[in-house]
């Protein structure tokens, strides 16, 4: 029987890329499965890039215009996605038109963590919904636990606990979780209500595909398998590695990679902060002082902070000579490079990279682990404060730049991290025989095994396909 799944990712490029990677793996594992990815497009550039990534004729794309301008707040984005339900409904109806020859059997929707309103459309078609959770299982566990406490009326007003030493027992962690490490989105009653509503919808699904590895987050996956939560499928690490060994047309990127090839193994610290990471002039100066004093070789992907990262991405500095400490380029000319945008995966793959200073986004974290590069985490927004705690305190797979950083770029909060704090983190990160480096190498091997035949990712994907097929058979007997 030919079956069809409909994937609905959020418009964020990192979510789109992870969705495409998982969809490709699923269709490769079952010849009777087809997938249509419905892309909510605000950018023709992102859309054309995504649709060019696959040549499989059982993986198709349906583009839905999100309008002329992307909403500039997450809550507005949620409302906007809800308004697109009629367009999604029409697209799916055409897809499974029973009057067409060889029309597939619609088996379900796989919705992004920020597209849960599309569960309503799946219900209209009488098919199950599954959640694709692009972040880590630990944070998913925290979110579900907070929702449980909220509904039981057993939750604090967390906005008052920012400077307290209160710790929360989170079932997806083995260590008590300090509320100082709680992302700021939970410390606003309005935002808390939004995410609690999302978590309730997570529980309505038939299963949750999580971008993680059992050997990486055993405690979190144990919690998610307790029977009160939809089945979790650890399908990670989902990584887009197609650009690792490609020849770059871009001259600057080629020069960067050649420079790395000339450096000793594990000698370069790489600083890169994702698609939304940018810094003020004052913070740039502090970081430059740290790199100067550390004495390490470095590759620094540096961009200017955006006043609203949902409205416009970080930009490039045009006056670095004026911003950086006097003589910085002269003193570091033989051991460092300051660049703009960077091809992160291709750089992490280079043997010269010995450490990665990162915002701790989950995609970046998995890429770093894949290549066996230890991280120093500097969380900037969203769930990254939790990621930092899990990676540093819970798992021993990273070092910290600043404990309990009080900034959040999404909410317009900032706090300067001093040169001394950054330098200390870099020196700790670049220790060649550290326990963190040894642990990262061990987990890196396990991440590679996860993607091999019979590994945890393949097992989870096959189990998911089996469950989807069985759910169809069950629904047919019920009807």
Curated annotation (Swiss-Prot):
Keywords of the record: Glycosyltransferase, Transferase
InterPro entries assigned to the protein according to its UniProt record, in alphabetical order: UDP-glycosyltransf_plant (IPR050481), UDP_glucos_trans (IPR002213), UDP_glycos_trans_CS (IPR035595)
Record keyword Nucleotide-binding present: no
Protein EC: 2.4.1.-
Classification via Gene3D superfamilies: Glycogen Phosphorylase B
MF (Gene Ontology): UDP-glucosyltransferase activity; UDP-glycosyltransferase activity
Comment on pH dependence: Optimum pH is 6.5-7.0.
KW Transferase (keyword) present: yes
Binding positions for UDP-alpha-D-glucose per the UniProt entry: 275, 342-344, 359-367, 381-384
One Pfam family named in its UniProt record: UDPGT
One of the protein's GO biological processes: abscisic acid catabolic process
Enzyme class: transferase
The protein's role, per its UniProt record: Glucosyltransferase that glucosylates the (+) enantiomer of abscisic acid ((+)-ABA). Is not active on structural analogs with alterations to the 8'- and 9'- methyl groups.
Family: Belongs to the UDP-glycosyltransferase family.
Protein name stated in the entry: UDP-glycosyltransferase 71B6
Species: Arabidopsis thaliana
